[in-house]
Amino acid sequence: MQSMPLLLRQSFKSTLNLTRTTRPVQRRPLLPAVGPNSLYPAPRNFSICLQCQFRTQSSLYSSDSLKDGKPAEQPKEDASPVIALPAGNANLEADAGSQQQAPPAAAEAGESTQSQQQQQQQQQQQEEKSEANGKGWGDGGLPSYIEQRRSQFTKRFSDVMDNLQSNIFVAGQRLNDLTGYSAIEMLKKEIHRQEERLRTARLQVRTAKDAYAAAINNRSTSQREVNELLQRKHAWSPTDLERFTHLYRNDHTNEVAEHEAQEALSQAEHEAEEAAAQLSKSILSRYHEEQVWSDKIRQMSTWGTWGLMGVNVLLFLIFQIAVEPWRRKRLVKGFEEKVIEAIEKEKALDRIQIVTAQNQMAQESSTTSTASTATPETAETAETAEPSASPADEPIADTDAIVTIESTEPEVFSSDPADAEPPANTIVSKPTPDNIREYIKFQLARVSPLLESLRQYLHDLFSDRQVVLTQRDLSTVALQSAAAGAAVIGMLSMIIRQR
């Protein structure tokens, strides 16, 4: 550290030698503070005051913190000021050890501090923006941003809901125009106007009555005073004479005012009567139009009700005549097909069982024939023992032989009884009366279930079978019957009217 007298001496010498400097002061150009890597390396001046040099060039020693992304610390406020000395004074350099480039270093330090402050401000703004977005009131929470993110369908739906009241009003106005209620609305407005007119006319009548009464009172008062003056005519004073003259002159004016008030009263009464008559006429016209409109709406509703009832009856008849039989026929047909399929399966199974039984009998007969050949002696003794054997046994032997011959042919049976083919001996090549009779019976068997089901349905409709119904079902049946009867009667009445 330099001593206080040395600093004073340096400052004094600098003030004396400022005028003798012939060398221009050369300063290093200032560079933008983009970071510690872009700055020039600070030259090492005379190491008289390294602490001051460190304070002035503090930005060069904060590269680690800038690399880590943290803002560099600002220089302390209690740092000692840098003494700027001229570069051309050789005596000052010899005495105190120069700091020739102190002003450029100070400028660079100022630029670095400004850049650090700007970086801090930018980081603070980014943090505030991120916090605002996180909380929901930043750019993502603004109404304009939310409005942009809305879909087209949502916007259209909101517009429709906003204009719902106006649309309903317009629809009601159109409906009134179609039904003729707009004229009734105009009559209502006219009635309100007539009521206001009648109210004003009555107020005018009241005012005219008050004015007429005031005019009558004024004239009667003046006439009374004139009569009093005439009674004491012999004792008139000049004042009484002037008063009598004034009253006599004003009597004509009072008479004219009375007549005018009377005419105004009669005119106001006439106008009030006319307004009342017009109002009553408008009210009667409105009631008449409303009655006509209500009759028209009632007639339209009646025809609409009849139309709906006719549509319901028509649908009922269509379902009962066309749909229900078709559905029932379809169900019966499906049931018949299933029954026929089951019968065919049973027949195939019976045939397979018969064939298997015949095979078993053939096998048993073959075993018995082998046993008979093995013991011929026993057979001969049996023949001698029974010489008078019946010739009916020979066809049995022949059939056994035939069965054995048929059993020698291999037969393959399918695992599915429905797909199993009938044996060859059951196939008939020529139609016989028995086969025709069976075919006819089979066709009649297919038709008979349908007829039987229809017969049972009709018998069930008119049978004495007890049925438990709920009140709802009973009411539905009654309403349907009433609707059908009303529809039939309405159709008959329309036909009769047309004729």
From Swiss-Prot:
Membrane-side (Mitochondrial matrix) residue stretches:
497-499
Q: Where is the composition biased (Low complexity)?
A: 96-125, 364-392
* GO biological processes: inner mitochondrial membrane organization
Its GO CC terms are:
mitochondrial inner membrane
Membrane-crossing ranges are 303-323, 476-496
For whether the record's keyword set contains Flavoprotein, the answer is no
- Recorded coiled-coil stretches: 181-283
The main place the protein resides is mitochondrion
Entry keyword Transit peptide: yes
Q: Name the keywords, alphabetized.
A: Coiled coil, Membrane, Mitochondrion, Mitochondrion inner membrane, Transit peptide, Transmembrane, Transmembrane helix
Tell me where on the tree of life, at the top rank, the source sits: Eukaryota
Per the record, what ranges lie on the membrane's Mitochondrial intermembrane side?
A: 324-475
Describe its partners and assembly state: Homooligomer.
Function of the protein: Required for the maintenance of the structure of the mitochondrial inner membrane. Involved in mitochondrial morphology. Causes growth arrest when highly overexpressed.
PANTHER family to which the protein is assigned, alphabetical: SENSITIVE TO HIGH EXPRESSION PROTEIN 9, MITOCHONDRIAL
Per its record, how is this protein called by name? Answer: Sensitive to high expression protein 9 homolog, mitochondrial
Organism encoding this protein: Aspergillus niger (strain ATCC MYA-4892 / CBS 513.88 / FGSC A1513)
